């Protein structure tokens, strides 16, 4: 996969793109990340990329010309998504990451900055994505999160496919509790079922823990999980009736 990032601060990505599984994946050419600075496409000698907002107001707004030129400089593959990182976008979810990693050869990420972007920049984007209902100083943070989440789903990044399938959100539920040695730490003991060797009981316990955690910590996820479960039951009934 090719990932092109339109960013005013390329240095922000230096450490994040070189560390851990993401760094290894890029070194192994599972994905490539190209950083493009819109200042290189500015129209004046001072390389200005922002200006005051029409109508007044605080802060500065990213100008459309450098962003359009930067995006249009990218050689596009047949299946490409242009994504604007903005607090006004749809929340980034595991489902979104799966869609992007599976259905596209190339992502072009536009990192917002300052008070925001000129509204016309939105015409470049196929979709807008947000990390959540909060404000950050820059779009580089959600861009790096998106890159990490997408690349780790690409074949070859994570050693065991089972690791991906067993994670939080993969089945719509939070993950079950994980334990390692020692079996007892400061009077806290691991659940006996995990030492039983009975894989069926362990699987049952883990599923119960997933359900319990999701109900308690993320009732919104549990509600969606239940809706999908009921829909699957209805779909099976219709299939059997045909």
Curated annotation (Swiss-Prot):
Catalytic activity as recorded in UniProt: guanosine(37) in tRNA + S-adenosyl-L-methionine = N(1)-methylguanosine(37) in tRNA + S-adenosyl-L-homocysteine + H(+)
Residue sites binding S-adenosyl-L-methionine per the record: 112, 131-136
Matching Pfam families: tRNA_m1G_MT
Source superkingdom: Bacteria
Annotated GO CC locations: cytosol
A GO molecular function held by the record: tRNA (guanine(37)-N1)-methyltransferase activity
Subcellular location: Cytoplasm
Any single GO BP term: tRNA N1-guanine methylation
Enzyme Commission identifier(s): 2.1.1.228
Keyword Coiled coil assigned: no
Keywords assigned by UniProt, alphabetized: Cytoplasm, Methyltransferase, S-adenosyl-L-methionine, Transferase, tRNA processing
Entry keyword annotation includes S-adenosyl-L-methionine: yes
HAMAP family: TrmD (MF_00605)
Family: Belongs to the RNA methyltransferase TrmD family.
Binding partners and assembly: Homodimer.
PANTHER family membership: TRNA (GUANINE-N(1)-)-METHYLTRANSFERASE (PTHR46417:SF1)
Known role: Specifically methylates guanosine-37 in various tRNAs.
Protein name per UniProt: tRNA (guanine-N(1)-)-methyltransferase
Native source organism of the sequence: Crocosphaera subtropica (strain ATCC 51142 / BH68) (Cyanothece sp. (strain ATCC 51142))
Protein's gene: trmD
């Amino acid at each position: 996969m090719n990932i092109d990032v339109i960013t005013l601060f390329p240095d922000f990505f230096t450490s994040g793109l070189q560390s851990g599984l993401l760094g290894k994946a890029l070194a192994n050419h599972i994905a490539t990340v190209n950083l493009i600075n819109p200042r290189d496409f500015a129209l004046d000698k001072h390389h200005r990329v922002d200006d005051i907002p029409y109508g007044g107001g605080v802060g500065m707004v990213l100008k459309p010309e450098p962003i359009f030129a930067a995006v249009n400089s990218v050689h596009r593959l047949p299946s490409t998504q242009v994504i604007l990182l903005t607090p006004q976008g749809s929340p980034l979810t595991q489902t979104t990451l799966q869609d992007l990693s599976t259905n596209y050869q190339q992502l072009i990420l536009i990192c917002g900055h300052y008070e925001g972007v000129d509204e016309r920049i939105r015409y470049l984007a196929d979709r807008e994505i947000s990390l959540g209902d909060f404000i950050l100083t820059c779009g580089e943070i959600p861009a790096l999160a998106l890159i990490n989440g997408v690349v780790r789903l690409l074949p070859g990044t994570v050693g065991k496919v089972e690791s991906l399938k067993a994670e939080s959100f993969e089945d719509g539920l939070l993950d079950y509790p994980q334990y390692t040695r020692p079996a007892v730490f400061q009077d806290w003991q691991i659940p006996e079922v995990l030492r039983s060797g009975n894989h069926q009981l362990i699987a049952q316990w883990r599923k119960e823990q997933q359900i319990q955690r999701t109900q308690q910590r993320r009732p919104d996820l549990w509600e969606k999980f239940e809706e999908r479960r009921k829909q699957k039951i209805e779909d099976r009934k219709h299939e059997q009736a045909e």
